[in-house]
């Protein structure tokens, strides 16, 4: 199969040029002006459009069981939505397994979830829900098998204490793995939540009030210090929602610590006023939405390079699930928002088209840096000879209003309903195969491949 994309502006993290792009057998073979292939091929005219590397979303939760509910997107509907939004690779955060289970247990479960369903290429982050000698011994074997990042939680049922965190950080560092962490102070949250529940204050706005930004920022600072104690272990903070936590990360970098951070579109574009609407339960997620001042601080980090990655934390529970389970009580509502289909378009519209970020920075945030950090570079995250032919074509001239009835996930609502975006995703190619074109999904379940990722190496830019 040969595909020639002509007349577009090809953009990588290190530059852009108007040139053609030739893909053969799923691999980029040539970039240049006026490419004339000697053999027949499909031609795609990208005149007036940008040709980007396919998006790499390193934070999704498909088919996750959170105890009170299972998310309504599985690895078909979730990756279908990703494909229609210009994302061609996902790394899914595996959910907790049975109490006392080995790391391999969840990997086998999740590979079963994704096989025969995933539309795009995929990998997983391991999850460390308890620490013992068997778990620590298992980590290097998992890295050898292509799982080079693992997640720790400082909140929820399987939160780790400081001693367990230190043990995990040391072994992951020694094994060539990157530690990712959900940082919130669980004890402080539990105290605040109990106060509100005792007072009968269970409306959605009290979800945000029970998880103030200081709970997140304190946990970020603690993880930074523990990583330093653990031998300057590399650390990746997921779903940052506030500026104070970003300040701590800036300080750590000034002290030459290997720390990286992601944020998500919801923290850049939605705010805590959503909790006071009639549909406030739609916006329950953790960390919660913050105020506009915190948004502005995050946008500064996006613009000046302090934030490395924009992912989604896509974790979809339908409004029907939320209402049935919660009965209007925030503390009983399953947490998470949909968004894997909207990430690329939202950041392009609100970042590039407003002048906040360059085209190159857009690529860095959405594909290049995620691929570098998580062992996929240069197979993913770049359009260059030898890389996978993963492409998203965006037409900046088109304006679109987001409406859930046009989306491809399995939810019954979108938090982005009514958002108007400048710039439209017109085509997505995965390894040279068109899987989305002009509003129509054309991929097939099961075509996605499991990606064995390389051990962690700090990116050199």
Swiss-Prot record:
Keyword annotations of the record: Hydrolase, Metal-binding
Parts of the chain that traverse the membrane: none
Cofactor entry: a divalent metal cation
Species name: Escherichia coli O1:K1 / APEC
Protein name: D-phenylhydantoinase
N6-carboxylysine, modified sites: 151
Annotated Gene3D superfamilies: Metal-dependent hydrolases, Urease, subunit C, domain 1
Annotated GO MF terms: hydrolase activity, acting on carbon-nitrogen (but not peptide) bonds, in cyclic amides; metal ion binding
List of residues binding substrate: 156, 286, 335
């Amino acid at each position: 199969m040969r595909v020639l994309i002509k007349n577009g502006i090809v953009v990588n993290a290190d530059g852009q040029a108007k040139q053609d792009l030739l893909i053969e057998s799923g691999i980029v073979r040539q970039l240049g002006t006026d490419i004339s292939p000697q053999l027949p091929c499909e031609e795609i005219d990208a005149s007036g459009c940008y040709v980007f590397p396919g998006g790499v979303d390193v934070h999704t939760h498909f088919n996750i069981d959170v105890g009170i509910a299972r998310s309504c997107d599985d690895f078909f509907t979730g990756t279908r939505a990703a494909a229609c939004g210009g994302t061609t690779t996902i790394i899914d955060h595996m959910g907790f397994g049975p109490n006392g289970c080995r790391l391999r247990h969840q990997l086998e479960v999740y590979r079963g979830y994704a096989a025969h369903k995933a539309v795009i290429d995929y990998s997983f982050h391991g999850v460390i829900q308890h620490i013992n000698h068997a778990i620590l011994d298992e980590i290097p074997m998992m890295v050898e098998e292509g799982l080079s990042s693992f997640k720790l939680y400082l909140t929820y049922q399987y939160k780790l204490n400081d001693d367990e965190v230190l043990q995990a950080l040391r072994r992951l560092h020694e094994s060539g793995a990157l530690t990712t962490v959900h940082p919130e102070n669980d004890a402080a949250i539990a105290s605040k939540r109990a106060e509100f529940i005792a007072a009968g204050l269970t409306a959605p706005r009290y979800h945000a009030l029970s998880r103030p930004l200081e709970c997140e920022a304190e946990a970020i600072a603690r993880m930074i210090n523990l990583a330093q104690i653990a031998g300057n272990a590399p650390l990746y903070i997921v779903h940052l929602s506030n500026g104070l936590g970003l300040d701590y990360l800036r300080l750590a970098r000034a002290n030459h610590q290997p720390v990286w951070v992601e944020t998500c579109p919801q923290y850049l574009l939605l705010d805590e006023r959503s909790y006071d609407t009639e549909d406030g339960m739609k916006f329950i997620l953790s960390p919660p939405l913050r105020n506009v001042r915190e948004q502005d601080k995050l946008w500064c980090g996006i613009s000046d390079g302090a934030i490395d990655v924009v992912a989604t934390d896509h974790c979809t529970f339908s409004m029907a699930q939320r209402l049935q389970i919660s009965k209007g009580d925030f503390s009983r509502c399953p947490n998470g928002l949909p968004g894997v289909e909207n990430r690329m378009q939202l950041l392009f519209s609100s970042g590039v088209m407003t002048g906040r970020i360059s085209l190159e920075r857009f690529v860095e945030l959405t594909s290049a840096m995620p691929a570098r950090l998580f062992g996929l570079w240069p197979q993913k995250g770049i359009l260059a000879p030898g890389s996978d032919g993963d492409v998203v074509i965006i037409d900046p001239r088109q304006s679109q209003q987001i409406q859930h009835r046009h989306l491809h996930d399995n939810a019954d609502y979108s938090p982005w309903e009514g958002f108007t975006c400048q710039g439209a995703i017109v085509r997505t190619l995965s390894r040279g195969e068109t899987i989305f074109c002009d509003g129509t999904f054309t991929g097939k379940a099961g075509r996605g491949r499991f990606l064995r990722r390389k051990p962690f190496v700090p990116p050199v830019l």
